[in-house]
């Protein structure tokens, strides 16, 4: 059913065969043309003194990985790592370096918000992480310089209340910093933080969550808020914080590990008809519910995927599958093509479920969502994008999805892996 948030899904479900028109020969030209469109739309690059002012050349470096050109650099890096695009690898990496170097200059000149120095998706930590990846992919030994700056940010986010708005969520808080470290560990095949650093960050997250839950008299052990709101979803909420604690659970004391699992089960109990409200205690309105990566089942699914991969308990996989069913029904979102609250973000749930189950039904569903992105219905009925190049709201994240659709055994939501 068509609603104000989503298009009606009129596709037939899986009947035993994948779409013939979604092979490499068909999709690769779409990827290439979309990349070229993104690169043509990029704003002028600056950095340093040129970055002053919202309309200056350096404004392109604002917004971090989420909406700035740093996110485009990551997309180009991601494409360069695919054997399917080996011929363009060097060009894409060189372009990525140019973009991320502008962002590095903006960071080094102090033109960015001091509160986002250690932010993964909105600030410095993400810039340094992607610079490390791009430099390393180019074979440059000086990749250790941005890596060293990333490591140094551990001291910034170690104090329990280092941000007034909330110190623990994914975009600007400690969960994001741990997530960035996880990405670097995966791509560099080495742990980039010391055990002492990891334990310090995890302990700060735990202490913060315990203190908040006690202060607010919650009937569960860990809770957090961001700008005063008790979010549950992946963008700013409990689910991604718990996901990061599970990702580093070997660094937790057994008693704290138990608190994390209790909180995971508490969140599972908050499910309302295959979905979760944006904030704790809300009742979902079925005709107006959010089915986004940022708020709702398509993002919370990743926590339960991680819980399943660690524990092998079927209730966690069953929860992921229910998330996928709702996403199939309501995931053709009108907000655009992106991964935060768009069609590609919905489709990534199917690629996740394929990796968890091996069921080709989920590749088919992802193919259908990819197909829908290029229909006139979507183009005319979706929201006009503020930035077509944004990694999270625009087409850069969509490119990552299309690449991953061609290599589903390695597919994972950008910068948010549960398989590390």
From Swiss-Prot:
One GO BP: peptide modification
InterPro entries: 6hp_glycosidase-like_sf, LANC-like, LanC-like_prot_euk
Xref: CDD domains: euk_LANCL
Family listed: Belongs to the LanC-like protein family.
PANTHER family per UniProt: LANC-LIKE PROTEIN, LANC-LIKE PROTEIN 3
Name of protein: LanC-like protein 3
Organism: Mus musculus (Mouse)
Recorded name of the encoding gene: Lancl3
